[in-house]
Regions:
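Flexible, acidic/Gly-rich N-terminal and inter-domain linker regions that tether
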Residues: 1-74, 78, 87-88
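Auxiliary Fe-S-binding modules of radical SAM enzymes
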Residues: 1-34, 227, 239-318
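Iron-sulfur cluster-binding cysteine motifs and their immediate structural context
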Residues: 50-57, 76-95, 105-121
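Short glycine-enriched, charge-decorated loop/helix-capping segments at active-site entrances
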Residues: 66-68, 209-215, 284-292
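Extended, non-globular alpha-helical segments
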Residues: 66-72, 119-134
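Conserved AdoMet/S-adenosylmethionine-binding subsite of the radical SAM
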Residues: 125-282
């Protein structure tokens, strides 16, 4: 019997109808937890990491992006925009984001796909109908559903409703979190989780504020809460050249984890990359770290060995 014909335990109407803002549902993911997974990416994040590879996730509301290389200057977008927020010239598309209401009329009118909407409103039940399509793959591979972002805890009611639907129907669940959230939001989601992927970016709170625009005291507090819950936990460290990949900084991060999480715990290192740079241009934003180079294999191995010296199992992702 296929997953499409499996019986489904429905959510209570009020839970299934809870709405969230989603910008991508990625099937067959193998990077966001064990096994084959579907990753649900949500809009909205309390951090503004200088290296963020998903700038389209930061704003909580839907937003229009543009790809100038596809624009043929037909003017259809300018004609249909009720806010007169779009103009075009020989250099491409200009969107006045103070005027734009993200109504998506320009996106629908564009014959070339030069305009794209990041973010759509969906109910928890609607998202579940999408992710349950691959239930047999989850069961066969030890996978499941991961909710990422942005920050999942930015939409706690929606995430709790979606995860409960998954768990009630035998699908393993996971979130990827930056850790910055109200305790109430975290506690609302924890009962429906099979695993947590928890980012630790910088040890010093002032440095954290400088590079992410938020201090890290609440993040460390929430790390303790997740660790105490007994839910399987993986620590993820995005390695940013010259910012947090030095020996001194990695030792400080390892010490924070040691002080707040009982071993054994796994640490995943995420090498720096520039895959998101093009999206900054599409959203009329500036990427601050374009001059940085990715780490060498030797540098990554040194970082891995340092983390392992603290008694952690450590992998390099990618």
């Amino acid at each position: 019997m296929t997953a499409e014909h499996d019986s489904v335990t429905p959510a209570p109407a009020d839970e299934g109808d809870i709405k969230g803002t989603v910008f991508n549902i990625q099937r067959y993911s193998i990077q966001d937890g064990p096994g084959i997974r579907t990753t649900v990416f949500l809009k909205g994040c309390p951090l503004r990491c200088a290296w963020c590879s998903n700038p389209e996730s930061q704003n909580a509301k839907p937003e229009v992006a543009h790809r100038d290389s596809l624009c043929i200057r037909c003017g259809r977008c300018t004609d249909v925009c009720p806010q007169k927020a779009i103009s075009t010239d020989e250099n491409g598309i200009f969107i006045d984001r103070q005027l734009c209401k993200s109504c998506a009329r320009c996106v629908d009118a564009c014959p070339q796909g030069a305009l794209k909407m990041y973010g759509v409103t969906m109910t928890a039940a609607e998202v579940f109908q999408q992710v349950r399509k691959d239930a047999e793959f989850y069961r066969g591979s030890g996978g499941g559903v991961t909710v990422s972002g942005g920050e999942p805890l930015f939409q706690p009611d929606f995430v709790a409703a979606l995860l409960k639907l998954c768990r009630d129907n035998g699908i393993e669940t996971c979130i990827e979190t930056c850790g910055l959230a109200k305790t109430d939001a975290l506690n609302k989601v924890l009962p429906y989780l099979s695993q947590v992927l928890f980012d630790i970016k910088l040890a010093d709170s002032n440095d954290h504020l400088k590079w992410t625009q938020a201090p890290n005291e609440a993040i460390v507090r929430n790390l303790r809460i997740v660790a105490a819950s007994g839910i399987p936990l993986i620590i993820r460290i995005p390695l940013i050249p010259g910012i947090n990949d030095t020996e001194d900084e990695l030792r400080k991060i390892a010490e924070i984890v040691s002080e707040n999480v009982e071993k054994p715990v796994k640490v995943n290192l995420l090498p720096y990359h520039k895959f998101g740079m093009g999206k900054y241009q599409m959203l009329d934003r500036e990427y601050q770290l374009g001059e940085l180079d990715t780490q060498t294999k030797d540098q990554l191995q040194e970082a891995k060995q340092l983390i392992e010296s603290y008694g952690f199992e450590c992998d390099i992702e990618g």
